[in-house]
Amino acid sequence: MGLGLGHAWFVSGFSNSLWMVVLLTIVSVGWRLLRADRGMGARPYEVSQVYHPAAHITETILKPLAKPLLVAPGQFVSAAFFEGPYFQGCGDFHPYTVSQVAEDGSLTLSIKALGACTQHIQSLQPGVAVRLQGPYGTFLLNRPVASEVWIAAGIGLTPFLALLRS
């Protein structure tokens, strides 16, 4: 791409290539907005089960409706919860750590009510459509073979749960 822009600049002069750079920038930003922010690259899932293991904590099991994401223990995904029976989702993508990865591709997310959207997720019901992006992160990817001591509290326990459950 850089060589193409350099060639266009050399052949047609600065004014034409400036428009090409502006056009390329608009297309790049537009694609990013459509693909990432609007969820075009997201995978469809559905809420299959919901648990409340503690006050203000929701654990939800998401089953894949298509090819599942390949998630390693401790990674996180961006999730957008949509409308379902008795639930009006936020519709925005928010990051959540995966606390369990099942063999069938189902994922468990542990969500603490900290803001408006996560507070609303406390009323989540099975059947709600979810779109997932990711996975992201490399939490303890290259773990040593030696013994480890893990220290965590609150919802920060989530990546450790994924490692324990795997």
Segments (PLM) and residue ranges:
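FNR/FR-type flavoprotein reductase catalytic core
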Residues: 1-41, 108, 113-166
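Ferredoxin-reductase
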Residues: 37-131, 147-148
